[in-house]
Curated annotation (Swiss-Prot):
It comes from the Eukaryota. The gene is adrI. Its EC number is 4.2.3.-. Its main location: membrane. GO terms for biological process: terpenoid biosynthetic process. This is Terpene cyclase adrI.
Amino acid sequence: MEKSTLLSAVLKHRDALASVAEFLRILAGICWTLNYFSMLRTSQKDKIPSTGIFPLCNDIGWEFIYAFIYPKASAHWEGGVRVWFLVHCIVIFFIIKNAHNEWDYFPLIQRNLYFLYGIVTIGFAIGQYSFAREVGPDLGFFYGGVLCQTLASLGPIAQILSRNSTRGASLLLRAVATFGGFIKLTIYYLTGNAAGPWFESPMCKFYIGLTLILDFTYPICYYVIRRQELVNDEGDKKKKTKSGKAA
């Protein structure tokens, strides 16, 4: 398959774009770090998890495999994956600390949250490792990251809809995660990683389209639910006012 005109131009001027890629790498690192600390802040503020179990555990599993088992596949991030793995280990501790508030109706899960999060993380790590063995670390790093990004985009939508509440949700968190994700894709393109299928690949186009749709759907869901919460709060205030007058 012939390479696209855009890809050919990028490869031709790769050296000139190296500084751009380096700047984007730093910017992406800042965005993802802000995303993780925003998770901590939101979870501590609302006392419930700010992210779902599957996105979080899959991220940690992917980061562990490509930070310590296949570090060469993530070498273009210059140690960033290891930093994110360590930060995620802090995040998951605070998430589990507040997760019991969501499981009052299921005591068995509530009593075994550390085991649950641990076994799911190990399961995803084994899956990521198996996939890397199957297709190679370079391609595994890319498509394993695709799964991370897809779950990171889908999970918050499922979470906010199932809760029917904006508690534990944050528009800032989603904004920096979305921005960081697409900076990451741009870096892959500029660095010309040989394993990357990039924009001429139907699968890559599907991934970009899917995550864009999901990321633009989230603020709509947030706005609709938040507006309903404000309406309900206003109704409760009026009821209290009437009750006070009647008394």
